[in-house]
From Swiss-Prot:
It comes from Saccharomyces cerevisiae (strain ATCC 204508 / S288c). Belongs to the PAPS reductase family. CysH subfamily. Its EC number is 1.8.4.8. The NADP dependent reduction of PAPS into sulfite involves thioredoxin which probably plays the role of a thiol carrier. Keywords: Amino-acid biosynthesis, Cysteine biosynthesis, Methionine biosynthesis, NADP, Oxidoreductase. GO terms for cellular component: cytoplasm; cytosol. The gene is MET16. The keyword Magnesium does not apply. This is Phosphoadenosine phosphosulfate reductase. It comes from the Eukaryota.
Length: 261
């Protein structure tokens, strides 16, 4: 039987994983998936870059925290985010985490505190010269380091099937063997319209770039507004074949991680 070794010496079998997904698909709301996950998995965090789905999850977690604990939040600061994203991060921290005496865990590229530091260390416009290396240094390595240092075994993500490409085949719970974590996708079956409706109905702060035609927001150099009728992630890496930044495709970077081990 296939077994997976997670952080904190937790062992999960493929049979368990399949059973969880079979049972969770029967639940009617994301809140039920979230509540079940909180009571089931130790060392549970949320990871987000403050996209709409992640913001919905934060608000749901906050409301559920009256009964359950509030999982801590991990943010990977690539040092290339839009200023609006960083402003939103501060707003979210003040609204949701400071009242619970929590701070958002921020991880940056190793040895860098600013975009200038990153360019000085790795060269200007690395994303144009070696896209995989950039993704590894700015996103994959900081996330891997965070999972280990914070002893994370499971994370909530904001991925949904309606985002298309590889995400259309998502399961509610997935294994990330390289990082030793489970990834839980509580809003897996929601559409963009459902997500935005929740944001508006619950007065959840969101990135002001959404009002300028952006839908999926990543680094400033690889994010564009989308046109009417386009896939919501069509503005990411426009003109390139890639659809993921690397954080959710860690196995692609196994060789880099081995070199750094």
């Amino acid at each position: 039987m296939k077994t997976y070794h997670l952080n904190n010496d937790i062992i999960v079998t493929q049979e368990q994983l399949d059973h969880w997904n079979e049972q969770l698909i029967k639940l009617e709301t994301p809140q039920e998936i979230i509540a079940w996950s909180i009571v089931t998995f130790p060392h549970l965090f949320q990871t987000t870059a403050f996209g709409l789905t992640g913001l919905v999850t934060i608000d749901m977690l906050s409301k559920l925290s009256e009964k359950y604990y509030m999982p801590e939040l991990l943010f990977i600061d690539t040092l290339h985010h839009f200023p609006q994203t960083l402003t939103l991060k501060n707003e979210i921290e003040k609204k949701y985490y400071q009242p619970k005496n929590q701070t958002i865990h921020v991880y940056k590229p190793d040895g860098c505190e600013s975009e200038a530091d990153f360019a000085s260390k790795y060269g200007d416009f690395l994303w144009e010269k070696d896209d995989d290396k950039y993704d590894y240094l700015a996103k994959v390595e900081p996330a891997h380091r965070a999972y280990k240092e914070l002893h994370i075994s499971a994370v909530f993500t904001g991925r949904r099937k309606s985002q298309g490409s590889a995400r259309s085949q998502l399961s509610i719970i997935e294994i990330d063997e390289l990082n030793g974590i489970l990834k839980i996708n509580p809003l897996i079956n929601w559409t963009f319209e459902q997500v935005k409706q929740y944001i508006d109905a619950n007065n959840v702060p969101y990135n002001e770039l959404l009002d300028l035609g952006y839908r999926s927001i990543g680094d400033y150099h690889s994010t564009q507004p989308v046109k009417e009728g386009e896939d919501e992630r069509a503005g990411r890496w426009k003109g390139k074949a890639k659809t993921e930044c690397g954080i959710h495709e860690a196995s692609r970077f196994a060789q880099f991680l081995k070199q750094d081990a």
